[in-house]
Amino acid sequence: DKQKATQRKNRGRLIRVALVGYTNVGKSTLMNLLAKSEVFAENKLFATLDTTVRKVIIENLPFLLSDTVGFIRKLPTDLVDSFKSTLDEVREADLLLHVVDISHPDFEDQIKVVEKTLADLGCSDKPLIIVFNKTDAYTFTPKEEDDLTPKTKENVSLDELMQTWMAKMHDACIFISARERDNIENLKTMMYNRVRELHVQKYPYNDFLYQTYTDEE
């Protein structure tokens, strides 16, 4: 689609951040929060079929944020064309935010599906932050003290999961609730630091980092 290609080309010297993830993990809700827009957020498959791009400013730093269609295990053939522009957006992104529904019982399998899709797109080496969403909906069943059976994933607390993933990902993951707006400011700080770092690398002579921006611009 030539028009979309031209639009992408004309976005200037701004770092591009793409929200990626399995379908129905809360990407559009997070997009609404970060971009203060009303992206169609609905609890069903493929609520976002087109790619939505917004200019976002955190502190003095503008960048482009795109909300992409959710990945699934087996993409229906008739939907492949609809995914073309969203996949181009992922390929052209400088930073990926991999949004995960941590309250879903199969969230680890969903992570693997997304990682495989990114690998198929040749995007495995892109800078990435895992955003574990829906912490407000996470539930687990504590084991009784005298229960000697092996612990299952149903017995793992949110704190234990956080410790495991933060040890694995170091500073490249964060736990939030977009719906409850929990930990969003820390996510913004993390995004600001990564985007600023990428911007200095990619556009070392662009001085807008030292200007003051407002949300209205």
Question: Predicted segment positions?
Answer:
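Residues at alpha-helix caps and immediate loop-helix transition turns in enzyme cores, especially N-
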Residues: 79, 109-110
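Inter-motif core of Ras-like GTPase G domains
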Residues: 79-104, 116-123
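Conserved G1/Walker A P-loop phosphate-binding module
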Residues: 1-91
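Generic enzyme active-site microenvironment
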Residues: 65, 99, 131
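C-terminal-of-GTPase-core extension/linker across diverse P-loop GTPases
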Residues: 1-36, 105, 109, 116-217
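The start of beta-strands in P-loop NTPase/AAA+ ATPase cores
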Residues: 62, 93-96, 128-129
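Short acidic (Asp/Glu) and glycine-rich catalytic loops that position anionic groups and cofactors
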Residues: 66, 92-96, 166-171
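Conserved Walker B
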Residues: 68-69, 75, 102-103, 134-135
